[in-house]
Amino acid sequence: ISEDLSKHLEKLQDKLPPFSITEAKEIVKKNLGQNMFNSIINFSEPVAAASIAQVHKAQIDDNGTIKDVAIKILRPDIKKKFNEEIDALMLFAYLIESSIKKTKRLKLIEVVFLLKEITNHEMDLRFEAAAANEYYENTKNDAGFIVPKIYWNYTSEDVLTLDWVDGVSIREKDILKEKNINIENIANDIIQHFLRHAVRDGFFHADMHQGNLLINENGQIVPIDFGIMGRLDKL
């Protein structure tokens, strides 16, 4: 695709219109309770907004230490909207299979059922937190690769809290060059880490687009957004 189209599509990764900070705080309060909500300080305006959720920077008290965290919050009514759209898609698949017999071999209805299962998992942030936690444990000794820590006391179905990462997206090539970071080496490292996790652990990040990979100040690769992970059975 053209570079111009690519830049427009990049906006879908983390630059969609956000919902208000007031709504965000209400969702956090409803999910975590008043006491936990009161322990969150410096709750920022949204720093990134995608189709399903948006992210705010904040601080929490972690056993006496103030930690910078990222709080991911599902969009209001997103589950309802997705279910309505999937129901419409299911009806469409049923009508196609009923009217065009040859399409039954495509198993369109089964595909829509699978899509519904996947999206239901992605819209319960506890599943993402569990995936991130497993990924963290698997990779904590991998040099040059860091998975943010999950804070379970600040995590629920609609809210996910993890370590804040100061980093540069791998899409920002000019900034990385200014920081004397070798882009070719980073690309090779990403591939090697991906293969290592898939082969060694049988568990890997399955959505490694530019918006989900950061390079921190130490030149380490930091993946974010663990809603889509892959698993391979070990031989």
Report residues per predicted region:
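Broad phosphate/nucleotide-binding scaffolds in NTP-utilizing and phosphate-metabolizing enzymes
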Residues: 1-197, 202, 210, 214-235
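Histidine-centered phosphotransfer motif of kinases
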Residues: 205
